[in-house]
């Protein structure tokens, strides 16, 4: 179910304060965050946010198309290595 419009989009306070400081100082630093649930705001465009995937921080460069999506959508948590080849030896 979608979030109610009267509530507005969600962003963790610590992430928003870090991004506001970066925008004010006009620096381009990588911001580390564990907040995969935060929504991407328009003032994040052009910055890089390192989103935690459970193992490491994945750098995500924010573009205009990403606004309104969640940070976790761009840092996959599972690595798919493909199905194993059909081996005759393992079928015994």
From Swiss-Prot:
It comes from the Bacteria. Keywords: Ribonucleoprotein, Ribosomal protein, RNA-binding, rRNA-binding. It comes from Bacillus cereus (strain ATCC 14579 / DSM 31 / CCUG 7414 / JCM 2152 / NBRC 15305 / NCIMB 9373 / NCTC 2599 / NRRL B-3711). Protein S19 forms a complex with S13 that binds strongly to the 16S ribosomal RNA. InterPro entries: Ribosomal_uS19 (IPR002222), Ribosomal_uS19_bac-type (IPR005732), Ribosomal_uS19_CS (IPR020934), Ribosomal_uS19_SF (IPR023575). This is Small ribosomal subunit protein uS19. SUPFAM superfamilies: Ribosomal protein S19. One of its GO terms (cellular component) is small ribosomal subunit. Transmembrane segments: none annotated.
